[in-house]
Amino acid sequence: MSFPIWFISTACTQLGIALIYAFTWQVFREKATWAKVLVVTGVGFMAAGLVGMVHALVTAPPSADSALVTRGPIFIGMVGYAGCFLWTALEGFHHHRMALRRLALGLTDPIVANRFFLWGLFGLMASSLTAISAVTALLGGRPSGTPITMLPMGVLGAAAATAMYLAFFSPAWYVGWLQSQAPKDSLGGSKDRARPRSARPQVSCVHASRAFM
């Protein structure tokens, strides 16, 4: 891969993860000072890793193994990646647990409650995938260089993508299944099942999460 293409792809990846940091902060901990510090710290680790990788590649001799000369900076950047996904998992599962309590009392929508779980599941799968990549890089290997790493990373990536799809683009069959599992007196229960999906009140993840805090 050419250096410009590598740099652009890595920068875009880091931008995407920075936006996930921002999303988790704004949705779950908008007013928490520690959350702002966490976002800045995580983005700082990613930026430091990128700068370190660029420096290592530019100054390394042509015959050097890129995986070896960049393993330190890659690991630093992966710390920022892992912080984002682990925080995402913790917030998702924490608010899912709180949502289940409200769901039992008929105070929330089963679809919203499930989205918290899916968001947490995405974070857990992505955290595990990042951990594999970080350890492999630290040992001087390439995550894509062996089936031992590619197979679990592929499974984890597919699980993370599925969780994101179900959370943000829930198909009708999945929504119906969630409603069938919900307590009868909850939002989305028997009363909502009699109404067309388009006529049901839409509860945003942002508003729901704030109500649970």
Language model segments and positions:
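Individual alpha-helical transmembrane segments in multi-pass integral membrane proteins
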Residues: M1-A56, R71-F85, G145-G157
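Juxtamembrane/interface segments of multi-pass membrane proteins
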Residues: M1, V58-P73, R102-P110
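Membrane-helix interface motif
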Residues: V51-S63, V135-L139
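Alpha-helical transmembrane segments of multi-pass integral membrane proteins
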Residues: A35-T41, F75-T136
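C-terminal transmembrane-bundle signature of multipass membrane proteins
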Residues: T88-G92, A113-F212
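Intrinsic-disorder/low-complexity, polar/charged segments
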Residues: M1, E30, P61, D109-P110, ...
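Cytoplasmic membrane-interface regions of multi-pass membrane proteins
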Residues: T24-R29, F93-D109, Y174-P183
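Histidine (H) residue identity feature
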Residues: H55, H94-H96, H207
